[in-house]
Amino acid sequence: AEKLGIKCYDKELLELAAKESGLCEELFASQDEKPTNSFLYSLVMDTYSLGYTNSYVDMPINHKVFLAQFDAIKKLAERESCVIVGRCADYALEDNPYAVSVFIKASLDERVQRIKRIYELNDSKAADLIQKTDKRRASYYNYYSSKKWGEAKSYNLCIDSGLVGVDGAIDMILKFIELKEKNMGKDI
């Protein structure tokens, strides 16, 4: 985002979605990328999707939060060029011809080293944090999108930052955008 001179939205998206939806910002923080993966919960709470009710009022709170974020992502992309981290942004923008979806991966060992530096954790705690975060993100993404988290066909570009480094990943993304703009005949 910095090299493109555009904003990057991560947690900031929660505040924006809360403002635009009128829902309490704390709801977004508590539900952030945390769907339920309980089949029983879905059966009980998702009765509205089976035709028993069709009211937004009756919708489970995690669905309301997701829809508010989904709408905020679409509106944000219409207003400005930006980078949006996570929250199924690629799914929300899959019909936007200017969107570029990127998945960046690295080996667990490389990620542990990075997390240790950032959060001052030992190997075990860093690995545990990574695995729990990955599980939560995959569950959220797979639950709300028609895609699979981390699967190459779900994204325009997948990069192994362990092989090319952070700067190499940035260069690859910038080159991808440059080539897409050239192919489209306009700036994205």
Question: Over which residues does each language-model region extend?
Answer:
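ATP-dependent small-molecule kinase phosphotransfer cores
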Residues: L13-S81
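A conserved segment at the C-terminal end of the G1
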Residues: A1-G5
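Short, amphipathic alpha-helical "lid/cap" segments that border enzyme active or binding sites
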Residues: F70, V166-L174
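Conserved phosphate-donor/acceptor-positioning beta-strand/loop module used by diverse small-molecule
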Residues: D95-I118, D123-Q131
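RNA pseudouridine synthases
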Residues: L76, C88-N96
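Small-molecule kinase domains that catalyze NTP-dependent phosphoryl transfer to phosphate-bearing small molecules
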Residues: E33-D46, N122-D167
